[in-house]
Amino acid sequence: MPPTLLLLLLLLPPSLASPDRDIYALAKLKAALVPSPSATAPPPLADWDPAATSPAHCTFSGVTCDGRSRVVAINLTALPLHSGYLPPEIALLDSLANLTIAACCLPGHVPLELPTLPSLRHLNLSNNNLSGHFPVPDSGGGASPYFPSLELIDAYNNNLSGLLPPFSASHARLRYLHLGGNYFTGAIPDSYGDLAALEYLGLNGNTLSGHVPVSLSRLTRLREMYIGYYNQYDGGVPPEFGDLGALLRLDMSSCNLTGPVPPELGRLQRLDTLFLQWNRLSGEIPPQLGDLSSLASLDLSVNDLAGEIPPSLANLSNLKLLNLFRNHLRGSIPDFVAGFAQLEVLQLWDNNLTGNIPAGLGKNGRLKTLDLATNHLTGPIPADLCAGRRLEMLVLMENGLFGPIPDSLGDCKTLTRVRLAKNFLTGPVPAGLFNLPQANMVELTDNLLTGELPDVIGGDKIGMLLLGNNGIGGRIPPAIGNLPALQTLSLESNNFSGALPPEIGNLKNLSRLNVSGNALTGAIPDELIRCASLAAVDLSRNGFSGEIPESITSLKILCTLNVSRNRLTGELPPEMSNMTSLTTLDVSYNSLSGPVPMQGQFLVFNESSFVGNPGLCGGPVADACPPSMAGGGGGAGSQLRLRWDSKKMLVALVAAFAAVAVAFLGARKGCSAWRSAARRRSGAWKMTAFQKLEFSAEDVVECVKEDNIIGKGGAGIVYHGVTRGAELAIKRLVGRGGGEHDRGFSAEVTTLGRIRHRNIVRLLGFVSNRETNLLLYEYMPNGSLGEMLHGGKGGHLGWEARARVAAEAACGLCYLHHDCAPRIIHRDVKSNNILLDSAFEAHVADFGLAKFLGGATSECMSAIAGSYGYIAPEYAYTLRVDEKSDVYSFGVVLLELITGRRPVGGFGDGVDIVHWVRKVTAELPDNSDTAAVLAVADRRLTPEPVALMVNLYKVAMACVEEASTARPTMREVVHMLSNPNSAQPNSGDLLVTF
């Protein structure tokens, strides 16, 4: 018996009857659970009156009693908790049979006394923030039985660590065991094979290792087994699992399995689901899998399987999902696949399949997803793919398909994505494809399509229309303006002629416009000004005439403008110098004239932007302007050019000096004044703690002084505080007032304060008043990854350490994206926001803060979505961020780890680390990943182990794909960093189908 429980029992008066003891335990439980301040009134557990007498406690919300007024069940599902813990007194409820405290974000540990409850049958602690080790049996003399009556235990999605609890044959009633989504380590105990009644085993999403025990094959009643995801086993699937005759679902995906797929699995006649994807399985698909007559879902994707799809799979008449993508399969797609009457999902992309797509595919009427991209398929696209009017995703890109696009696809109203790029398709595009009500992407680039665009266009949800590199001609119809959701319009390298229709101005969400390489004529329409979201415009290689419209200078977020190789005349609008967002300009090879402005954005453009315009002069152009054109202040050409260069230098020097002076003086004066005011208003401070803290708000305020500053950034100023023996980092948010009176801020920060993860910097609480918010974090003594990597100690951070830091940071981000409810997008992932503790373990910092900054920005932070050099390219033209934006930023961090270089600077004008790596590797005679990573690797380190470096490079390049949909999720990133063979380079848009 745990000593705590023994002490509790000794302290209770002998006269305390059992129901009264239950009331005492309930009072302790209520006192230990702190409701969220944002909870609705009345607060949770308000009816739990500690002064109640029996049997009033039986009416408490969530409490159930038996006929003797003994508590037999407690159900507190989704209780909105701010903090708290499970008290040891809960073990006094000796009649308790069902304890459910789920989805409450409950922190703390599982009390050691909990396993001693003699009647406990159902224990559900899932979806909380419980941490520490799970209690193990007391080894002392007279130990109480360990969960003697347990039938169900669900601790899914917590932060539990250590070894798995030692359940064994003594737990003869245990039917349901779910410990997934934690951080348990070590091997699966062999004793789990002695749980004779077990029907459900969930150990997925931990960090387990060792071999999968053969003893699990003795679980003859087992119906569902989930033991994959993040676990890293040695060896493969035990062939003995073929003896699990009752098994319905087997999920061993993403857990480093090797070896063949055991043919013995074919004996599992009741099996409904077999998931073995994202492993390193090799060999051929065993024909015995064709004996799985009940199978509905088969996923063997992302392995090293070879050979052909076995003919025996024709027996899988109940198959709904067949995923075999990213293997090394060859041969043709068997015709019997078209005969699967229940088939909804067929994904075979990225193999070496040849031949035609089965002609009858889709006739079954249930097909929803078809992805056969990146194979060597030939022949026509079958006409019946959407026969059942259910097809949603059609991806056939990067094959050798030929013939016309079937007209039937234009009538497929359920399609959301059509990707047929990089084939040899001919003929006109079916008019219906431009009017699909659900489609968000139509991609037909790099084919041999001809004809003209229809006069009727109206797909309300089409966000990307990609028709480049074909032979489509005629005019661009005015109806192109009837696509309200359109963000990217790509019509380059076709045969379009006539004017760019003014209706283009109706596209309010348009962010990228590319009509280059056509035969368009007329003026650049003024209506482009109505496309306020435009970030990239390419009108090059056409026959546009007239002047560059002054109205285009009103596009506030335009980053790229290319009007080269046209017939434009007149002068450059001087207002273009005020387009602060414009980073790339090309007006070359036109007939422009007059002076190039010598101010604003024009200071960053070089001569190549203006070449081929004999009438241009001044600025970076070699020809100097005559004195009259230069406004009477000219002189010799060399003098004018010298003046322009000097002006650039002067602007830079003045700006740099001013920034340093303001920062220095402001920091001294501002910090001093702020602290003085803080002292005067010390009573106005309020501290909200997310765990027990031994210091006060005033203690925190006293630490906020200039001598304690350890960092400054876009989110605020960071101070190192030491008070009452506690060491913490204090972040003073800039540009935001409101303090305790901002309920929205308080609620949001409270949400962040509930987050508990090993690789996330813990938010301890916050201190606020009317003007200021101070966030309190655990202190990380080794600073940031950026400081370490780019400072004098960067050379001491070896490849193994860099890979470990990458994996740890990825786990933290993965938790924010996939395991938080609601999910959290970081918005400012960078090496300076990855902090290192005393053991150099990585912790993600500043998560979720970007939304609190309002208009506050700094020289290194954009207004909304992150720091320069880390911002995903799509943000420039969508102004939206999502999880894939974080993935891109994380890819930049990986490139920093690989190269040892900062994300910007030292690469040339307008070049960041991503474009530099692409440029360097593209110029190599050897296009292997090994050659690529060696070409850009940090020269401070010895280039070994190469395999580890290559894996980091592969993952990095997948993360920084241009198209956000092509990037992996952070869950996939964690997997790839943990499983080197699964990191596929250049996967590009293939990942869009996940």
Swiss-Prot record:
It catalyses: L-seryl-[protein] + ATP = O-phospho-L-seryl-[protein] + ADP + H(+); L-threonyl-[protein] + ATP = O-phospho-L-threonyl-[protein] + ADP + H(+). LRR repeats lie at residues 73-93, 94-117, 118-141, 147-171, 172-194, 195-219, 244-268, 269-292, 293-316, 318-340, 341-364, 365-388, 390-412, 413-436, 438-459, 460-483, 484-507, 509-531, 533-555, 556-579, 581-604. InterPro entries: Kinase-like_dom_sf, Leu-rich_rpt, Leu-rich_rpt_typical-subtyp, LRR_dom_sf, LRR_N_plant-typ, Plant_LRR-RLKs, Prot_kinase_dom, Ser-Thr/Tyr_kinase_cat_dom. Disruption phenotype: Semi-dwarf with altered numbers of floral organs and rachis branches. Reduced number of tillers. GO terms for molecular function: ATP binding; protein serine kinase activity; protein serine/threonine kinase activity; receptor serine/threonine kinase binding. Residues 704-978 form the Protein kinase domain. Glycans are attached at N75, N98, N124, N129, N159, N256, N315, N352, N495, N509, N514, N562, N578, N606. GO terms for biological process: cell differentiation; regulation of floral meristem growth; specification of floral organ number. It is an enzyme of class 2 (transferase). It holds the Pfam family PK_Tyr_Ser-Thr. The chain crosses the membrane at residues 647-667. It is found in: Membrane. PROSITE patterns: PROTEIN_KINASE_DOM, PROTEIN_KINASE_ST. Residues 1-17 form the signal peptide. The active site is at D828 (proton acceptor). Changing G205S: In fon1-2; enlargment of the floral meristem and increased number of floral organs. Expressed in shoot apical meristem, and after transition to the reproductive phase, detected in the inflorescence and the floral meristems. Expressed uniformly throughout the meristems. Expressed also in floral organ primordia, such as the palea, lemma, lodicules, stamens, carpels and ovules. Its main location: membrane. Receptor-like kinase protein that regulates the size of the floral meristem. This is Leucine-rich repeat receptor-like kinase protein FLORAL ORGAN NUMBER1. It comes from Oryza sativa subsp. japonica.
